[in-house]
């Protein structure tokens, strides 16, 4: 397959380099387009009215393109550069840190995959624990081999797969669980501080681990020790409310 590879951790991130190596080993043609620097939390943002520049990156057997933009910018530029031979698949990751629950709303990793499905291309987001329970290469090997087992005919256009690895060794995982997104996530605490000149500023604290929360969802199963696969879609229409409001009179 021709695969467009991206992330939000940046072109030099170990997760991107590791899965690049594994995909190439399996015979895929891999084209990395990733941010020049880390852009975690960029979500679906794009760089409007800002020049986007590209730089070829060579490092041993690795060849990729660094872009001074967001993860979504990287997918857009990548698709433009590959327009004569479009990718069969877009992979975003492997991210350093889980993207489950409400974190999905902020995730540049998931947003990059979502941009792929907006373009009509099958897309997957991979995330591992922030702490390296296993070497990054172990997650990459598993992720690359998992691709062989995914039946993309079961994933309609306009949807992606969001895959997360739990904070235990891959060998100790309970297996793979297909599940829904939780409405629970990390708690973000704001701290008001002052710089050396006494000027106040705000700082978002490091993540606070979530509790098990809502049963049968990605957060729940991840904490139980499962690898989670959650199908997501960019059409955010609330169908039940839509139907109810259609029956409502606004006159």
UniProtKB/Swiss-Prot annotation:
Q: Which InterPro entries match?
A: SurE, SurE-like_Pase/nucleotidase, SurE-like_sf
* Catalytic activity of the protein: a ribonucleoside 5'-phosphate + H2O = a ribonucleoside + phosphate
Q: Matching Pfam families, A to Z?
A: SurE
Provide the cofactor note recorded for this chain's UniProt entry: Binds 1 divalent metal cation per subunit.
Which sites bind a divalent metal cation? 8-9, 40, 95
Which pairs are disulfide-linked?
none
Q: What class of enzyme is it?
A: hydrolase
Major subcellular site: cytoplasm
- Gene Ontology CC terms: cytoplasm
Q: What is its EC number?
A: 3.1.3.5
UniProt-listed NCBIfam families: surE
Tell me the protein family, please.
Belongs to the SurE nucleotidase family.
Q: Matching HAMAP family, A to Z? A: SurE (MF_00060)
This protein is called: 5'-nucleotidase SurE
């Amino acid at each position: 397959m021709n695969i467009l590879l991206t992330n939000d951790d940046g072109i030099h991130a170990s997760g991107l380099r590791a899965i690049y190596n594994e995909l190439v080993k399996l015979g895929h043609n891999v084209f990395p387009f990733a941010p020049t620097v880390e852009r975690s939390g960029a979500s679906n943002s794009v760089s409007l009215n800002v020049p986007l520049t590209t730089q070829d990156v060579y490092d041993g057997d690795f060849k990729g393109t660094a872009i001074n933009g967001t993860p979504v910018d990287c997918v857009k530029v990548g698709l433009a550069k590959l327009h004569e031979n479009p990718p069969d698949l877009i992979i975003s990751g492997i991210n350093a840190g889980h993207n489950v629950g409400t974190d999905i709303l902020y995730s540049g990793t998931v947003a990059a995959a979502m941009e792929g499905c907006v373009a009509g291309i099958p897309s997957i987001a991979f995330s591992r624990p922030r702490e390296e329970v296993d070497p990054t290469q172990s997650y990459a090997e598993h992720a690359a081999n998992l691709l062989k087992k995914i039946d993309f005919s079961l994933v309609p256009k306009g949807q992606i797969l969001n895959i997360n690895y739990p904070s235990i060794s891959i060998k100790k995982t309970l297996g793979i669980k297909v599940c829904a997104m939780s409405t629970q996530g990390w708690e973000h605490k704001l701290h008001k501080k002052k710089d050396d000149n006494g000027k106040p500023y705000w700082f978002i604290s490091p993540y606070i681990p979530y509790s098990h929360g809502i049963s049968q969802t990605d957060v729940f199963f991840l904490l139980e020790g499962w690898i989670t696969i959650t199908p997501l879609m960019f059409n955010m229409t609330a169908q039940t409310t839509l139907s109810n409001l259609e029956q409502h009179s606004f006159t």
